[in-house]
A protein has these predicted regions:
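Active-site hotspot residues in diverse enzymes, especially metal/ion-binding acidic/histidine motifs
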Residues: 1-267
C-alpha cells in the first residue's frame, strides 16, 4: 500500500531538516492519512487500531519486548528502529540484560504497555511512533524528499541515531505550551500531536463534543473551569468519559484535547 507522504514547507537545516510546523499542518496531514487509510473514521467517531495501522498501512514490523531503560524513573515505552541495529532488552527468564538485533522498519512496544487495563497507553504509544515514522522518516534515515528543495547530503558522522527511544514523558505529554523547544523536543511534540490528531480527528471530534454539550443543555461556547461546579463536572468528567469510551484514549488525553480545541478553558 502506498502511504500519503509528508512534505513540510519549511525545515530546520541546522538540525537534520527537522520540520518546522504549525499544529494545524499536522491536523491536516493526519486527516489526509485517515482519508487514505480508513476514511470511515472521518465520518463516524471510533477507535483506530494502532497495530493494523503500523503494520498494514505504514509497512512496519511490530515487536514486543521488555525494553531496558538506564533510568527506571523514565521508562522507554516504545521505540522506532529506522535502520537495522541493536537494542537492549531485559531477559526475564535468565534475569539479565541482553542486546538483540532488530531489522530496519520496526516498532518495538514495551510489554508493560500492553498489559490489560493499559489499552489507551498502548494506543497512544503506537500512534506516537506512527508520528515519528510519517513526519520524521527523512530526519532519522537521511533519505531526501523526491524532488524536494530541502534535500541535503547525508553525513554519517552528523547523523542522528536511527533508533528513536520514546520515554514516558515524550508520550504522556501534559499539553503545556512551550515555545522554546529544542529540535528533539519539537520532534517529540510533532509525534505526540500527530497521535492525538489521528486518534481524535478534528472533523469528528468537534461535532462529537458539541453533541454532548447540547445533550447536557449547554449552548454557550467554551466552558471556563472554576466558575460553576456542574459545568466543571461536565467539562472534566462527563465529556472526557464519553471521549474515552469512543476514541479509546485516556481521560487525561481527552482533557488535553478539549483544551487544545477550545472547548474548555482554565480560569
Amino acid at each position: 500500500m502506498t502511504i500519503v507522504k509528508f512534505k513540510p514547507q519549511r525545515v530546520d537545516r541546522r538540525n537534520h531538516n527537522t520540520p518546522i510546523l504549525f499544529d494545524k499542518e499536522i491536523d491536516e496531514y493526519a486527516q489526509a492519512v485517515l482519508a487514505d487509510y480508513k476514511p470511515e473514521l472521518l465520518s463516524e467517531p471510533g477507535t483506530i487500531n494502532f497495530q493494523h495501522f503500523l503494520e498494514s498501512y505504514l509497512g512496519m514490523g511490530l515487536d514486543f519486548q521488555d525494553i531496558y531503560s538506564d533510568d527506571p524513573e523514565r521508562p522507554i515505552l516504545a521505540m522506532t528502529v529506522f535502520k537495522k541495529g541493536k537494542v537492549r532488552v531485559f531477559d526475564k527468564e535468565n534475569e539479565r540484560i541482553r542486546r538483540i538485533t532488530v531489522p530496519a522498519r520496526t516498532v518495538i512496544i514495551d510489554n508493560a504497555v500492553m498489559e490489560p487495563g493499559k489499552e489507551s497507553l498502548a494506543l497512544f504509544s503506537g500512534m506516537h511512533e506512527g508520528g515519528h515514522i510519517t513526519i520524521h522518516w527523512h530526519v532519522y534515515t537521511g533519505e531526501t524528499y523526491d524532488g524536494d528543495e530541502y534535500s541535503m547530503d547525508y553525513n554519517e558522522e552528523d547523523a542522528l541515531n536511527p533508533i528513536v527511544c520514546c520515554r514516558r514523558e515524550h508520550i504522556e505529554i501534559k499539553g503545556n505550551m512551550k515555545k522554546d523547544r529544542t529540535a528533539k523536543e519539537w520532534r517529540e511534540h510533532h509525534a505526540d500531536y500527530f497521535a492525538a490528531a489521528i486518534i481524535m480527528p478534528i472533523i469528528t471530534f468537534k461535532p462529537f463534543v458539541n453533541k454532548i454539550l447540547r445533550e447536557n443543555g449547554y449552548y454557550k461556547g467554551a466552558i471556563t473551569i472554576g466558575r460553576d461546579d456542574d459545568l466543571d463536572i461536565l467539562a472534566d468528567d462527563i465529556i472526557p468519559d464519553a471521549i474515552t469510551e469512543t476514541y479509546g484514549v485516556s481521560k487525561r488525553a481527552a482533557r488535553i484535547k478539549l483544551r487544545k480545541t477550545g472547548f474548555v478553558l482554565n480560569k
